[in-house]
A protein has these predicted regions:
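Receiver (REC) domain switch/active-site residues of two-component response regulators
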Residues: 134
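N-terminal nucleotide/polyanion-binding subdomain common to many enzyme families
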Residues: 1-83
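Generic recognition of short, well-ordered alpha-helical segments
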Residues: 18-22, 103, 127
Length: 135
């Protein structure tokens, strides 16, 4: 069975280039995994395509806004379900999260589908993590 991996990021072109090479590239070519990268900026509602803002409730630095991430994830989940895939296991990749170890990769590899949400800036608005994250 082919594993489906979707990546929500601000840098989909960079992800595509890296994930088309080496072991992952060969796995894609052989049909072991199906991979798609999604641009979070495409889901903003402002003309400037801005995705960062001050943290809700205050705090230092800038965080990724909840709305474009939420809309992107909901759209990806809908697309996957319409294509006959199960709801993906949603993982938010942030500096404050659990380290990505070999053991964690083995656990994630057992899932039928994944939606990896890549953080940037000081982090991700906690409200979207609470709403969507499985991890």
């Amino acid at each position: 069975m082919t594993m489906r991996i979707d990546i929500a990021t601000l840098f989909p072109e960079m992800c595509e280039r890296v994930l088309s090479e080496s072991i992952i590239g060969r796995a894609r070519q052989r049909g072991y995994i199906e991979l798609a990268c999604h641009q979070i900026r495409d889901y903003t509602t402002n003309r400037q395509k801005q995705v960062d803002d001050y943290p809700y409730g205050g705090g230092p630095g800038m965080v990724m806004q909840a709305q474009p991430i939420y809309d992107c994830c909901v759209d990806v989940i809908r697309q996957m379900e319409e294509a006959g895939h199960a709801r993906p296991h949603v993982v938010f990749m942030t500096a404050a999260g659990t380290p990505l170890t070999e053991e964690k990769c083995k656990q994630l590899a057992q899932k039928d589908s994944l939606l990896l949400v890549c953080g940037h800036y000081e982090g991700i608005d906690e409200r979207v993590i609470e709403a969507l994250a499985d991890e």
